Amino acid sequence: MKGSRFKLNQNHAPIHEALETFRRMRVVPFDVPGHKRGRGNPELTEFLGQKCVGVDVNSMKPLDNLCHPVSVIREAEELAADAFGAAHAFLMVGCTTSSVQTMVLTACKRGDEIILPRNVHRSVLNALVLCGAIPVYVNPEVDQRLGISLGMRREQVEKAIKEHPKAVAVLVNNPTYYGICSDLRAIVKMAHDAGMLCLADEAHGTHFYFGGGLPVSAMAAGADMASVSMHKSGGSLTQSSLLLTGPNVHAGYVRQIINLTQTTSGSYLLMSSLDISRRNLAQRGRQIFHQVADMAEYAREEINAIGGYYAFGKELVNGNSVFDFDITKLSVHTLDIGLAGIEVYDILRDEYDIQIEFGDIGNILAYLSIGDRAQEIERLVSALAEIRRRFQTDGSGLLSQEYIDPQVVTSPQEAFYADKCSLPLRETEGKVCSEFVMCYPPGIPILAPGERITAEILDYIEYAKAKGCNMTGPEDPDILRLNVLAGRE
């Protein structure tokens, strides 16, 4: 693109173009998938449309192979790397969960230490269960008013690196679900000075690569790997993601790690959506996210004018634990109207037909992205104003803290695979948990394998259940019982 920052022709979408060419060839399918371009499953075709099922095809020479790309998929990955300023990019069809796990499995082996905040997505801890690495937690500060965890302070990271000089990597959220950013450039430098990799969970930061006035992206900050949820703010289909790597990471080894866990039947619907969405962002991303940021700022002003709500933004920035803030994130504190965030979340859907991203103990998040319009913002603002009028209470008995510092007893892998027993929830106090417990979204564990179960945590779990949070993780779907390490206090 002439006059742009890109080196390659970002008007090109090789997977999409190859699929269009293949469609015109009218090839007779004697391969999988068995619906045979939709003919074998007319109900599915009626639901999804012929154009969709017609390109739900298998890997073949004209369309390349995700496990070992040599033509159109490889081209698409090179274009993605160019668009995002990375040395290499990998198309991921197992969502950013797969991307995050690949980062950790690439950096760590059994017994290695990795420095990370505790408010990470469960995919990070899942990877520790798989590879046997040992977490060194940097417990984030908590904003006392909002009850949310913030970023990692520079001095906390520096201390962790000094105390654990053999750690192999530092992992950073860029940003958190709420839009909070740590000082990524400084953390990258500290990690590299100590001979460690810096990994970024950038599930909520796709737009950082294309928007002006937004926090620094992981690749621009010099991080070694970043997991980017293109489907969240980039416009691709759900479950599609990108894994980005810097120049000091061996791309061939990363591909081998990916192929340990990712499907051998990569969806061309997902891959083509990544290809088309990358092209769209390269061509129009800066304009799009400028508009998104403007909408979010307008919504913040309007919501704060209602009274009783606090739509927080850049005023949280303190130069350290909140080094920067993603202004596209529309996070709203609700406790001052006497309602938990999850209660407002449910009311918006059930009473006003508005589905927001999530509600937690004290906040809601409305996720704004490339598909939002001003009229939807007005509808959300009006609904919040009416909720305050109809449902406001005195708020007695509401919890306010979203984050509880963990008491780590043993590694996630050791605890997950250890002998265990199932106990009624209230009888687990003081025991060591051997499974995950979390509200989803956001998917940040309240408890992880290897952590001690405290009365405070049990109170939180029961409160979150009572308020209607979607609780996931344990074997018992009702979370009346938990698995704990047998014979271990």
What are these regions (language model features)?
Residues 53-98:
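Conserved N-terminal alpha-helix of the aminotransferase class I/II PLP-enzyme fold
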Residues 91, 137-139, 228, 358, ...:
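Structural signal for conserved beta-strand scaffold positions within catalytic alpha/beta enzyme cores
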Residues 298-474:
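Conserved C-terminal alpha-helix-loop-beta "cap" of PLP-dependent enzymes
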Residues 470-489:
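Charge-dense polyanion-binding interfaces
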Residues 63, 90-92, 170-173, 331, ...:
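Short glycine-rich or small-residue beta-strand-to-loop segments that form or flank ligand, phosphate
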Residues 1-71, 442:
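N-terminal "arm"/small-domain region of PLP-dependent enzymes with the aminotransferase-like
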Residues 37, 177, 232-233, 248-250, ...:
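Short, glycine-/Ser/Thr-/acidic-enriched flexible segments
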